[in-house]
Amino acid sequence: EGAEQDGSERTDGGRPIWNIAHMVNNKQAIDKYLDKGANSVESDVSFDSDGKPEKMLHGIPCDCGRKCLNQMSFTDYLDYMRQLTTPGDPKFRENLILIMLDLKLKSVAANLAYSSGQEVALQMLNTYWKRGESGARAYIVLSIPTIKRVTFVRGFYDKLHSEGFDQYREKVGVDFSGNEDLDETGRILSSQNILDHIWQSDGITNCIFRVMTRLKKAINKRDSNGYMVKVYYWSVDKYTIMRKTLRAGADGMITNFPDRLVSVLNEREFSGKFRLATYDDNPWERYKA
């Protein structure tokens, strides 16, 4: 499926880049970062002791220079995002094309991960997609902190199927953010029959420098038809690191300063080779120059 497709049908302007605003957990932050040029947002879903999604909250510690405790309820978040991503809605923002849910599953017992996935799918069906009544169109990336919680993904997909909404499977992909072994991640995904719509990240908090060795390894895997179709880096705030990330061939980055990435993409070195992704760019296709 997506992993096998050639993303070369849109070569105008070069590789599409997902400019993902970091830790966007209340309405004010959402509006602020969209105004700064983000085309995607990354938001933190925290869970209660039963593994049910409760609120958008990162918690302490978080990236340097950011407030860690901004929050809103999960259902209020989904409802607001539905409005922002529905053409014709008064609040519609055409540039918001992808929502990455950073699922804080390390606090959830492993045996609850499957039911957590079902619960998140159910709430998205009811509040974001409104069981087919909503025109909300964003692509969704389920970002899992460790491959040890991969059953969350199965639960999510199984719930879409059992509720009769397999069509939303086309809108949903997965990502694993734990900097785990890439080969092992690929093997586990294959064993779970998760074979498409896969992103792979590498990174660390903006407070700490990280070498790009693993990022480049992931990009090499992507380009040799590995399990992932997109590779992104986090959290990237410095202009110099943004440039290095683009030169390495990444498909996007999480940043606290999306306006800086917009500026870098307009620099002479990058403006012909990269561009901000739009809704017409399929996030589940591997880009071929």
Curated annotation (Swiss-Prot):
Mg(2+) binds at residues 42, 44, 102. GO terms for cellular component: extracellular region. Residues 1-2 form the signal peptide. Expressed by the venom gland. Keywords: Cytolysis, Dermonecrotic toxin, Disulfide bond, Hemolysis, Lipid degradation, Lipid metabolism, Lyase, Magnesium, Metal-binding, Secreted, Signal, Toxin, Zymogen. It is found in: Secreted. One of its GO terms (biological process) is killing of cells of another organism. GO terms for molecular function: lyase activity; metal ion binding; phosphoric diester hydrolase activity; toxin activity. Its EC number is 4.6.1.-. Dermonecrotic toxins cleave the phosphodiester linkage between the phosphate and headgroup of certain phospholipids (sphingolipid and lysolipid substrates), forming an alcohol (often choline) and a cyclic phosphate. This toxin acts on sphingomyelin (SM) and on ceramide phosphoethanolamine (CPE) with high activity. It also acts on lysophosphatidylcholine (LPC) and on lysophosphatidylethanolamine (LPE) with moderate activity. It is not active on lysophosphatidylserine (LPS), and lysophosphatidylglycerol (LPG). This is Dermonecrotic toxin LarSicTox-betaID1.
